[in-house]
């Protein structure tokens, strides 16, 4: 895992959802732990796409629930 990638994800989540970065861990679930609704998650996905210059397809977007899943997806896409 890249600490830089995690830090960038953390910053996006902090900015988009208005939560403290200390609450954002790998196992953090956007909806259950941070109170995000489905629109918040869509906006997060769009912010990740822009920040990391990736495209998250609809199937993958529906499966992304935690910070760990975002990180793994970004790393897999970046390796292509």
From Swiss-Prot:
Keywords: Chloroplast, Fatty acid biosynthesis, Fatty acid metabolism, Lipid biosynthesis, Lipid metabolism, Phosphopantetheine, Phosphoprotein, Plastid. Pathway: Lipid metabolism; fatty acid biosynthesis. 4'-phosphopantetheine is transferred from CoA to a specific serine of apo-ACP by AcpS. This modification is essential for activity because fatty acids are bound in thioester linkage to the sulfhydryl of the prosthetic group. It is found in: Plastid, Chloroplast. Residues 3-78 form the Carrier domain. It holds the Pfam family PP-binding. InterPro entries: ACP, ACP-like_sf, PP-bd_ACP, Ppantetheine_attach_site. PANTHER family: ACYL CARRIER PROTEIN, CARRIER DOMAIN-CONTAINING PROTEIN. Belongs to the acyl carrier protein (ACP) family. Carrier of the growing fatty acid chain in fatty acid biosynthesis. HAMAP family: Acyl_carrier. This is Acyl carrier protein. It comes from Trieres chinensis.
């Amino acid at each position: 895992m890249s600490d830089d990638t995690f830090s960038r994800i953390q910053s996006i989540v902090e900015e988009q959802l208005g939560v403290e970065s200390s609450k954002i861990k790998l196992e953090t679930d956007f909806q259950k732990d941070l109170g995000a609704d489905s629109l918040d998650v869509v906006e997060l996905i769009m912010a990740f796409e822009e920040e990391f210059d990736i495209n998250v397809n609809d199937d993958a977007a529906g499966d992304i629930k935690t910070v760990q899943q975002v990180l793994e997806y970004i790393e897999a896409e970046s390796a292509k």
